[in-house]
Amino acid sequence: KLLTDQDMQDDIFTPFGPTVEPYLTEQCMIPKEPFEMARTAWGDRIDIMIGGTSEEGLLLLQKIKLHPELLSHPHLFLGNVPPNLKISMEKRIEFAAKLKQRYYPDSSPSMENNLGYVHMMSDRVFWHGLHRTILARGARSRARTFVYRICLDSEFYNHYRIMMIDPKLRGTAHADELSYLFSNFTQQVPGKETFEYRGLQTLVDVFTAFVINGD
């Protein structure tokens, strides 16, 4: 076990990730904290398209199935206040109460009542970082930023959710959009009369238009 109980509580779901390299050489890729590197990133000079799915947080249910006690942990909401904020514990507790009110205003999280958790993890693990990136580019970049949010809740075509998370769940999970953009091992093509096919056409049109025309 490489992850500690505290890591699990902090939603660190992999022991691997970018590491600041201690020696500055020609081959060095991460000489300082990514937050600092982003302020002078060459990517700010080019147009980008960035986005995600509506229920990215479904991915985190895999962890909850293994550790359901995390949903009743007293620090569930406190642990989702960004750890890098330089604020007092009293302020953190205040923010944690606001998170509870936002995602579970009239109930408590549980395996049967996990939708609030899914939305909180979608925001905390994925959309919060996307939002900060979009705002940062708007403040310091003259290049354009195109943002997409994909919500295609299919019973049969959201392959990542069905095969990797839970076939009984609904929503558009992390990586579900790949089935609409690329062919895969299922060799499955939805019928032209379905909303899945219309979603496929729309996504391919959006991405190819960006590649060809830059908008």
Swiss-Prot record:
It catalyses: a carboxylic ester + H2O = an alcohol + a carboxylate + H(+). GO terms for molecular function: carboxylesterase activity. Its EC number is 3.1.1.1. It holds the Pfam family COesterase. PANTHER family: CARBOXYLIC ESTER HYDROLASE (PTHR43142:SF1). Belongs to the type-B carboxylesterase/lipase family. It comes from the Eukaryota. Glycans are attached at N184. This is Esterase B2. The lineage of its organism: Eukaryota, Metazoa, Ecdysozoa, Arthropoda, Hexapoda. Keywords: Glycoprotein, Hydrolase, Serine esterase. The active site is at E56 (charge relay system). Overproduction of nonspecific esterases is a common mechanism of resistance to organophosphate insecticides. The keyword Lipid metabolism does not apply. It is an enzyme of class 3 (hydrolase). It comes from Culex pipiens. There are two such esterases: A and B. Alleles of both A and B are known.
